[in-house]
Amino acid sequence: MRIAIATCRRKPEPDPDEAPLLAALRARGADVELLAWDDPAAPRPADFDRMVLRSTWNYPEDPDGFRAWCERSAAETELWNPLPALRWNLHKRYLLDLQVRGIPVVPTALLARGAAADLLELAADRGWTDVVIKPAIEN
């Protein structure tokens, strides 16, 4: 079986799980390859039997392009990340959806695009000492 592990050309940091994942799949007989979603010279998803989206960290830089790539990929090969789930979690509001369902998540606050906010005050009001800031991405 030929498996693509979707990633991106420029990763913000090394992925410590990447090498063990590739080794485990290869040990089970899979022909596995990293496939950068944002590399026009990369093989097409149709060249693979299956694909899993793994470390496509830079999709916030081109959310429309990434969304279109996911749609094309789903038409060409079997995605192990179901397309409806991919669409749903492209926007960080999915964290609030999970929280409402009682699923533990990192405490989350969404800010409207362009909103003036004092992040230190927001964190202090919520009792947060550690903060992660990510783009929400519009659907």
Q: Model segments located where?
A:
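Active-site nucleotide/adenylate-binding loops and adjacent lid/helix of ATP-dependent enzymes
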Residues: 2-7, 70-75, 84-139
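Extended interaction regions within the primary functional domain
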Residues: 29-30, 100
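Short, surface-exposed alpha-helical segments at coil->helix boundaries
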Residues: 15-19, 63, 67, 92-95
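Short, charged N-terminal beta->alpha structural module
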Residues: 1-28
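Short, solvent-exposed loop/turn segments at secondary-structure junctions
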Residues: 10-11, 58, 138-139
